[in-house]
């Protein structure tokens, strides 16, 4: 065959010489496209730019403006970094280096930890290698040949990866004298890498196993141009200012203490108040939507966890104890007690759906290396609910949860994205049950009218799920809400209801959280608002500030009125300058400062000032109460 035909995204066909590559296709369309092309898609699969085309293939050309481009750029930049490290530190052993949502990383086994000065040297070497315009080439070897190659190079981590793959052939990428094991695709040349920055260093165990060697993980990011990179780095600097761990200390919200234990939060008065506000909000919103509030025990017999499948699939993340020679598991999830409530009496189809809601505290054994402030802890409280319904009610219930999420996230000012995660390799339940559950979730997503993605193989072991990822003020994604469909646990615990025909049927269970872990959500809120909580959420809504000691009696009376009316108010009657006291209240990010001087005492008023410095009209204490109540009612 001397000629082939390929189909372009618009449906048109284009003839090419046999053996033509994606680059040749781009060049045949135009010189500008050939210059902009970095990779391609053949029949939906990402491939390198020089990949040969087959007759009848559906082809798409990837440029820096394509949605897929950033991952390719970042993956190639991680290889460039590994090449630079090997050039500067020849004894370093390379392991893995994927692209991630915020950039990329690469793990190295080195004799000494990298320093900030080392990162500067690595970056400089990367720039040198990028300018060298090295060709990035893909080749396939048999696994035996690839193992021999990497053994000869002393790269035993790569040998282990190839052995674990168990494939007949593997693909390698080379650029200059650097060779790496990789599926690809990659950029055509190192000169295509134009804008990057190494951002941090961390420790990471090989394959996440604490019994394996500790490696040095170097994080970085890369973009198509320097303008995008600079904008991202500016967001990173802003994120550092908003870091919930930093603000948590400054605002006296929470702390951690090694004497207490890693990953266990100690809530201070202001933090506990913030938590209480959220929990009260949750209870009110759930009651409005027909949920029943329930509460289960902290420990349950190990036999129950064995019956549920948690012991088999999740026990490495659980804590166990023995009481009176009986083994118990500290709950990592709230579902089992809810099933016991359902089983406590005979259920009719007329009773369904039942919606059990619990602000349940759970404990999970997270590895020390992954703990991160409030975002990853070992003890946390979930706004956990389980809906038990008939199969016919399932679609409506899932749609109801998606609507619930939409309304709640609107109150907090979050946009969100949805992702359907399907059956993982390690799972329980029949094929039919998984198919039914997956289709129910998919139908609800389609009917929601919102965009969604499908994440193959990332569902929970007991059912498919919808993950809902919030977008914060810095355009970061946070996974909080989850909707999981479960046909398995009702069967394991023999949950039934009597149908209209008098026969016993199996209910469907939906596990769902709206905010997710309260701790994690508070961490996200702190960073989203930079600690400047809206009035309805603020642990302290106002502080009364006196000008001199002469105003203390009136200010105290006003304080008592506000507090009695339910306003979260504090006072600052110290013998300090007014400017000092106002500045301190601003640093504590309190929404309103109520200044009391001689004029306010004489008029029976307060002089409100917003934390940004804007002065409001004077108000009586009663007027200020109404003002705050109005803000709280409208979630301002």
From Swiss-Prot:
Its cofactor is Zn(2+). Binds 1 zinc ion per subunit. Signal peptide: none annotated. It comes from the Bacteria. SUPFAM superfamilies: Class II aaRS ABD-related, Class II aaRS and biotin synthetases, TGS-like, ThrRS/AlaRS common domain. Keywords: Aminoacyl-tRNA synthetase, ATP-binding, Cytoplasm, Ligase, Metal-binding, Nucleotide-binding, Protein biosynthesis, RNA-binding, tRNA-binding, Zinc. Residues 243-534 are annotated as: Catalytic. One of its GO terms (biological process) is threonyl-tRNA aminoacylation. Homodimer. Belongs to the class-II aminoacyl-tRNA synthetase family. PANTHER family: THREONINE--TRNA LIGASE, CHLOROPLASTIC_MITOCHONDRIAL 2, THREONINE-TRNA LIGASE. This is Threonine--tRNA ligase. The gene is thrS.
């Amino acid at each position: 065959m001397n000629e082939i035909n390929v189909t372009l995204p618009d449906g048109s066909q284009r003839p090419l010489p046999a053996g033509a590559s994606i680059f040749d296709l781009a060049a045949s369309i135009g010189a500008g496209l050939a210059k902009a092309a970095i990779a391609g898609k053949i029949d939906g699969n990402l491939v390198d730019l020089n990949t040969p085309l087959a007759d009848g293939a559906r082809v798409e050309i990837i440029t820096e403006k394509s949605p897929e481009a950033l991952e390719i750029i970042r993956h190639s930049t991680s290889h460039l970094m590994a090449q630079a490290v090997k050039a500067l530190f020849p004894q370093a052993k390379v392991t893995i280096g994927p692209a991630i949502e915020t950039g990329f990383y690469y793990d190295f086994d080195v004799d000494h930890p990298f320093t900030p000065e080392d990162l500067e040297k690595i970056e400089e070497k990367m720039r040198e290698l990028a300018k060298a315009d090295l060709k990035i080439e893909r080749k396939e070897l048999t696994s035996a040949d690839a193992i021999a190659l990497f053994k000869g190079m002393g790269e035993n981590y790569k040998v282990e990866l190839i052995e674990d793959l168990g494939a007949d052939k593997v693909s390698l990428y080379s650029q200059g004298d650097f060779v790496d094991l990789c599926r690809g695709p990659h950029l055509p040349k190192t000169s295509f890498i134009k804008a990057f920055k190494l951002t941090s260093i961390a420790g990471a165990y090989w394959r996440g196993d604490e019994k394996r060697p500790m490696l040095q993980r170097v994080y970085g990011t890369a973009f198509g141009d320097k303008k995008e990179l600079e904008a991202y780095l500016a967001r990173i600097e802003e994120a550092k200012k908003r870091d919930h761990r930093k603000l948590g200390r400054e605002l006296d919200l929470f702390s951690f203490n090694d004497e207490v234990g890693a990953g266990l939060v100690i809530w201070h008065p202001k933090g506990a108040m913030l938590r209480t506000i959220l929990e009260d909000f949750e209870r009110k919103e759930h009651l409005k939507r027909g949920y029943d509030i329930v509460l289960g025990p902290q420990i349950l017999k190990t036999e129950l966890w064995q019956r549920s499948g948690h012991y088999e699939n999740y026990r490495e993340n659980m804590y166990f104890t023995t009481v009176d020679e009986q083994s118990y598991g500290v709950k990592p999830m709230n579902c089992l007690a809810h099933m016991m409530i359902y089983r406590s009496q005979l259920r009719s189809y007329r009773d369904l759906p039942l919606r059990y809601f619990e602000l349940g505290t759970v404990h999970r054994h997270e590895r020390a290396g992954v703990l991160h402030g409030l975002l990853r802890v070992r003890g946390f409280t979930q706004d956990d609910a389980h809906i038990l319904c008939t199969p016919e009610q399932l679609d409506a219930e899932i749609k109801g949860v998606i609507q619930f999420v939409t309304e709640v996230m609107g109150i907090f000012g979050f946009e969100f994205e949805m992702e359907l995660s399907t059956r993982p390799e390690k799972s329980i339940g029949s094929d039919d049950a998984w198919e039914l559950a997956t289709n129910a979730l998919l139908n609800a997503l389609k009917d929601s009218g919102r965009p969604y993605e499908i994440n193959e193989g990332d569902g929970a072991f007991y059912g498919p799920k919808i993950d809902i990822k919030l977008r914060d003020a810095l355009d970061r994604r946070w996974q909080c809400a989850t909707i999981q469909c479960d046909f398995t646990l009702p069967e394991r615990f023999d949950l039934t209801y009597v149908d209209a025909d008098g026969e016993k049927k199996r209910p469907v269970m939906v596990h769902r959280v709206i905010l997710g872990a309260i701790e994690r959500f508070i961490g996200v809120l702190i960073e989203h608002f930079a600690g400047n909580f809206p009035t309805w959420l603020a642990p302290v809504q106002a502080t009364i500030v006196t000008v001199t000691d002469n105003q203390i009696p009136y200010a105290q009376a006003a304080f008592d009125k506000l507090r009695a009316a339910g306003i979260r108010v504090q006072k600052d009657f110290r013998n300090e300058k007014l400017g000092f006291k106002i500045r301190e209240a601003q640093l504590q990010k309190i929404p309103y400062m109520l200044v009391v001087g001689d004029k306010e005492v004489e008029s029976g008023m307060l002089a409100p000032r917003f934390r940004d410095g804007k002065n409001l009209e004077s108000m009586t204490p009663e007027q200020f109460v109404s003002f705050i109540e109005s803000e709280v009612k409208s979630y301002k």
